[in-house]
């Protein structure tokens, strides 16, 4: 395969929720539950409307919270990624994700801080590069077929940042 058209743009981030611990039996009203805020945010993230211009994804891959069974949780962590078929679509999902997270924090009276952990751009291969790879593959003994490109989902890849820089200098 000489080219793939479906590297999605992606943004990876953590959301740290900070509430107030309280004894869950004696004084639950003194607590501000970071776990519930993170759970509400998770549900809201997975309810983000799709974009009309292409595919999008959001995933909460990790949720950690609490310190004990009789304590209103004072902290919670979500590890989240957004994806989009284009940089614009990914930005749409990311922006909506930030709104959902802030809304959940406000709803439960807790603080939240998000921290960017990584990103990659959407990418398609250069037609000239694909043609060159195909011509080179045809010269290799044992290669029976060099497929021009695949349109199956390719996920997201850090290498797309390098690909974009190379394409800028062609």
Set out the residue ranges of the language-model regions.
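An extended, acidic, His-containing surface patch that forms the Zn2+-binding/catalytic region
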Residues: 115-170
């Amino acid at each position: 395969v000489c080219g793939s058209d479906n590297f999605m743009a992606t943004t990876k981030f953590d959301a740290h929720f900070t509430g107030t611990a309280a004894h869950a039996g004696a004084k639950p009203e003194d607590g501000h539950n970071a776990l519930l805020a993170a759970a509400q945010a998770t549900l809201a993230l997975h309810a983000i409307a799709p974009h009309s211009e292409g595919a999008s994804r959001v995933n909460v891959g990790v949720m950690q919270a609490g310190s004990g069974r009789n304590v209103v949780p004072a902290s919670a962590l979500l590890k989240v990624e957004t994806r989009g078929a284009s940089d614009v679509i990914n930005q749409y999902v990311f922006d909506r994700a930030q709104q959902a997270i802030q809304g959940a924090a406000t709803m439960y009276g807790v603080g939240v801080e998000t921290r960017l952990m990584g990103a990659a751009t959407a990418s398609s291969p250069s037609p000239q590069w694909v043609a060159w790879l195909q011509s080179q593959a045809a010269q290799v003994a044992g290669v029976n077929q060099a497929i021009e490109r695949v349109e199956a989902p390719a996920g997201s890849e850090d290498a797309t940042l390098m690909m974009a820089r190379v394409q800028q200098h062609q």
